[in-house]
């Protein structure tokens, strides 16, 4: 399958059409952004690492019964996916307090959240992805009540699968975001799962192994991403 026209250019990925109206090609770039795209830098190998990381994770989720848009890996930084009608709301699961939750509520970073928190955010960079709830989704027609319930169920199921995967690799899955869409009317997991959209800490040292290394200018971003990939069994060569 060959890529045709550029359909959309995001902060770290470019989406291309193909000869089929049902499929797209995602190209993972080396760009890394923070502050809603106001700060952007490039890191060698990042596109390759995130592409293979995402492919690995999506396959794990498929094996667990979570439908994803993933079709097949095309190259080091490209993957073929189903074309979804994307829901304009992203789901966030929080197992420990970090990021915006700490700022918003003054909770100590690292506090265990039991049960895990499920948050919703409208995908709108210009408004800094405002937090919303189920009522907003229904009132504004962003997603039906039934499909939102399925998104929530799949988010928690993904959390169970991935928390165990990372725990066995000596890592804590602190939080992560998921994006869903519809394919032939069915809720399907789209976009990506990588250290760009999740928080991962080393279990012993609590070192941050995700994009917070870039946000907080800690250094060693790609080294951390590659270490996480190595621990969970992603082949990067």
From Swiss-Prot:
Gene Ontology MF term list: ATP binding; phosphoribosylaminoimidazolesuccinocarboxamide synthase activity
Q: Does the keyword Mitochondrion apply?
A: no
Superkingdom is Bacteria
Key words of the record: ATP-binding, Ligase, Nucleotide-binding, Purine biosynthesis
Its recorded reaction(s) are:
5-amino-1-(5-phospho-D-ribosyl)imidazole-4-carboxylate + L-aspartate + ATP = (2S)-2-[5-amino-1-(5-phospho-beta-D-ribosyl)imidazole-4-carboxamido]succinate + ADP + phosphate + 2 H(+)
Q: What class of enzyme is it?
A: ligase
User: Any idea of its EC number?
Assistant: 6.3.2.6
Signal sequence annotation: none
Gene3D superfamilies from the entry? Answer: ATP-grasp fold, B domain, Phosphorylase Kinase, domain 1
One GO term describing the cellular component: cytosol
KW Nucleotide-binding (keyword) present: yes
Q: Name one GO biological process term.
A: cobalamin biosynthetic process
Pathway(s) where this gene product acts: Purine metabolism; IMP biosynthesis via de novo pathway; 5-amino-1-(5-phospho-D-ribosyl)imidazole-4-carboxamide from 5-amino-1-(5-phospho-D-ribosyl)imidazole-4-carboxylate: step 1/2
Pfam families noted in UniProt: SAICAR_synt
Q: Which family does it belong to?
A: Belongs to the SAICAR synthetase family.
**NCBIfam families the UniProt entry points to:** purC
> What protein is this chain from?
Phosphoribosylaminoimidazole-succinocarboxamide synthase
Lineage of this protein's species?
Bacteria, Pseudomonadati, Pseudomonadota, Gammaproteobacteria, Enterobacterales
